[in-house]
Amino acid sequence: MAEPLTGDDLRGGWTRARTMLLDLIPQRFRRDRPVVPVVRLTGVIGLSTPLRGGLSMAGIARTLDRVFGMRNAAAVALAINSPGGSPAQSHLIFRRIRELAQEKNRRVIAFIEDAAASGGYMLACAADEIVADPNSVVGSIGVVGGSFGFDKLIAKIGIERRLYASGEHKAMLDPFLPEDPSDVERLKKLQREIHDDFIALVKARRADKLNGADETLFSGEYWTGRRALGLGLVDAIGDLRSTLRERYGDKVFTPLVSADRGLLGRRVFGVSRDELMPGGLAGDMISALETRALWARYGL
């Protein structure tokens, strides 16, 4: 009669079985390799549409949760390619990355591709280390807003503007009304507040790394990655693959974790939900032009 199995026998059998199973897994998927998941933060920051790929807190939150929830991750890499966009959305994404990094005790490394400008640079500041290509566009730490004035045009062609509003400033900066200097001053005050918050964030994250006068660093100017290194806006010149292989070894596994578009973002019969909405396509075309203009500001 066979002797009953002991706890040591069971543990030994499990170890051998586990080893055999691991041998069947391709090398690139084994957990014994260092793992650094990569999150792409690409496009104009704000609400996304079918023709305007962009970034928003709603669109990236679940992806960030998944990445920082990977127990075997040695670090988290952010691949950033953004000319900026909404200050609020930029800050929301920044805060979520910092909160998750602290909760999960994860080091975050940002890799700048074409650009990390304005809100895109705010995202980069969520990292513990920023690496840029020598030709990346970096900086543009400022706030910008713009509009058009159509009041003279509609008067010339005989169109009368009729606007009904409750609240003294509800129609502030209406493009079909003559520009009011007091409205412009209110807008500039709002922009100064947002700019001050942006400056405080950069100073808090970069601390003693910054190497330049405030008048230079926070003027809204942007620089190449190489020049940004001298100003202390980035920590190193390099690229994602080479840097991670140097830090974590040639066998480092860098899975790209894509954002989940969700049910409402999926396409039905080749058409997305947004495109089915009245005026959706026209709005997307305008958004696409605005996106193109924002990239063009940096020569991209």
Feature locations, PLM:
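N-terminal organellar transit peptides
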Residues: 1-133, 144-300
